[in-house]
């Protein structure tokens, strides 16, 4: 618990170093579908997407603990995925900047068997806070669906990156 709190405080401190700037939020959804179970862990898939569509910042991939149902654990799930709980997902991971205050977050979740994948994607898109970094805001928010995996990407387009390029890389990883 103390490690989690220290990590969250360190992340908040890192994100607070940049000046506050305002952007308008224009979320969109670009769903794709497949009927097969996606192979690989969420961390592996995130890393493959970044290999195809490299970023110019030091980023890292972290699994999201879905078993922690404490207040802090549920906050972490909501903060990263936009979902209120892990009822419809079995695995999740996030890729983001390790230092600095950048509006960038890419999350992948594996949906539970029988879960409505499109509903999970919509819940992520509508539940995520594009201003979660306080001083910066994502102006591009997209989700993509492939089989039992949902990817959520949000970023500030002023960074020179586009959410669509990450959706395209996700589709390449999936062979679509």
Predicted regions and their residues:
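Positively charged n-region of N-terminal signal peptides that target proteins for export
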Residues: 1-4, 8
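C-terminal motif of bacterial Sec signal peptides marking the signal peptidase cleavage site
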Residues: 15-19
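Bacterial signal peptide processing site
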Residues: 21-24
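Surface-exposed, low-hydrophobicity interaction/linker segments
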Residues: 38-97, 117, 121
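A short, solvent-exposed beta-edge/loop patch
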Residues: 98-99, 135-176
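A short acidic-to-branched-hydrophobic micro-motif
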Residues: 102-113
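Short, conserved charged micro-motifs
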Residues: 114-122, 160-164
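An anionic, turn-rich surface loop/hairpin at beta-sheet edges
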Residues: 121-142
């Amino acid at each position: 618990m103390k490690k989690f709190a220290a990590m969250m405080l360190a992340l908040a401190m890192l994100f607070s170093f940049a000046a506050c700037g305002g952007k308008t939020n224009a979320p969109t959804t670009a769903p794709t579908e497949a009927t097969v179970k996606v192979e690989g862990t969420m961390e592996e898939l995130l890393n493959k997407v970044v290999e195809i569509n490299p970023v110019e910042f030091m980023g890292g991939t972290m699994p999201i603990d879905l078993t922690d149902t404490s207040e802090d654990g549920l906050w972490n799930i909501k903060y990263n995925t936009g979902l209120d709980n892990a009822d419809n997902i079995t695995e999740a991971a996030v890729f983001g900047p390790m230092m600095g205050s950048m509006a960038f977050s890419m999350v992948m979740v594996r949906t539970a068997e029988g879960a409505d994948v499109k509903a999970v994607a919509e819940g992520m898109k509508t539940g995520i806070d594009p201003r979660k970094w306080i001083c910066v805001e994502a102006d591009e928010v997209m989700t993509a669906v492939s089989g039992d995996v949902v990817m959520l990407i949000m970023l500030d387009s002023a960074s020179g990156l586009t959410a669509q390029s990450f959706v395209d890389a996700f589709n390449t990883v999936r062979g679509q």
